[in-house]
Amino acid sequence: GEQVRIPMAVDGHFWVEALVNGKPTRFLIDSGATMTTVGRNTADLVGLRVSEERNQLVRTGNGVIRMANARAQTLEVGGIARENVRIFVAENDDLNVLGMNFLSSLRRWSVEGRWLILEA
């Protein structure tokens, strides 16, 4: 299968340039996040159809916030592509987070030294 190696950034996190509906989008990879989440600006830029209701209650470090639901036609990291991916949209946050709903679709993922390795 496909393997993608992502180097650890100087901030100690793993950042990746993914394609959402074919458009480049920078994500923080966060195995502590259940769902992949983007900010409203990103959702608009990549053409996500976002639900009107913000009916997803999500617990964050700042308490519980409401988010809207969307689906990406495609979400691609390196050569690993997934279709019809559920994404939460945060109204006031511009941090894009690649969460477990993407990571758990992989055959395997691991951190080895300063590398995150994704295997499809």
Predicted feature residues:
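Pepsin/retropepsin-fold aspartyl endopeptidases
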Residues: G1-A120
